[in-house]
Amino acid sequence: MDKNISFTLKVWRQKGPKAKGAFETYQMKDIPGDTSFLEMLDILNEQIINDGGEPIVFDHDCREGICGMCSLYINGHPHGPATGATTCQMYMRRFKDGDTITVEPWGSAGFPVIRDLMVDRSAYDKIMQAGGYVSVNTGAPQDANAILISKDIADEAMDAAACIGCGACVAACKNGSAMLFVSAKVSQLNLLPQGKVEAARRAKAMLSKMDELGFGNCTNTRACEAECPKNISISNIARLNRDFIIAKLKD
């Protein structure tokens, strides 16, 4: 059975996008080790509300590692020290009694702070709107086996599609680049027959939108790959670069 721990929590508080933020310190006592990180924040918020304060604003939805909403920078790592897991999948047993835990929002020009730990990640939606889809005529769908796809290609596309768009890659990158996200979303479509028709347009449009929204350039430090909760490979970035170069040569 996991032991209870007590620790110091330093949380970034900021009232709005243009307000000046600062860390506030809270003492957490006897938190069970099997408490998830977000449940711990729920406990803290209940204490703050009972004391008449403003609860900490943070993003969450499914709490199952699927939606990508729980975007917290914990002790210098996107989603915390756990590998291959989102914030909501991390439990307090990963920390020691007496630890100091620092919690911040994603730090990137592409993800401005809304309030406290919540950031605006709508830039990702805009990138997807630029080309993260396959244009089709409406009508009855084809049978699943109508277009044969080799297993190795299907596996690569599925691995790329595992990206949940959380933004950890941007938070981890010293340049604030969204290349891992963009390359995963381009790859999951460009690898498949249905996506190849628009492959050139997709690569150019999504990269152009990424640059327009203020994300930085990729310099291959691989921090994004190391911190990605879904273990997305930077081989997708190499594929996107190839697709982009080929597309520009065809212009």
Q: Language-model features: where?
A:
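Short strand-turn-strand beta-turns centered on an Asx-Gly dipeptide
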Residues: 12, 29, 74-76
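Glycine-rich phosphate/adenylate-binding loop and adjacent beta-alpha elements
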Residues: 74-98, 103
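Ferredoxin-type iron-sulfur electron-transfer modules in oxidoreductases and energy-metabolism complexes
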Residues: 35-54, 101-251
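Eukaryote-biased recognition of intrinsically disordered, low-complexity regulatory segments
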Residues: 4-27
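Short, contiguous acidic and Ser/Thr-rich linear segments
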Residues: 24-36
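Short, structured protein-protein interaction patches enriched in aromatics and acidic/basic residues
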Residues: 57-69
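Long, hydrophobic/aromatic-enriched structural stretches that serve as scaffold segments
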Residues: 53-54, 69-73
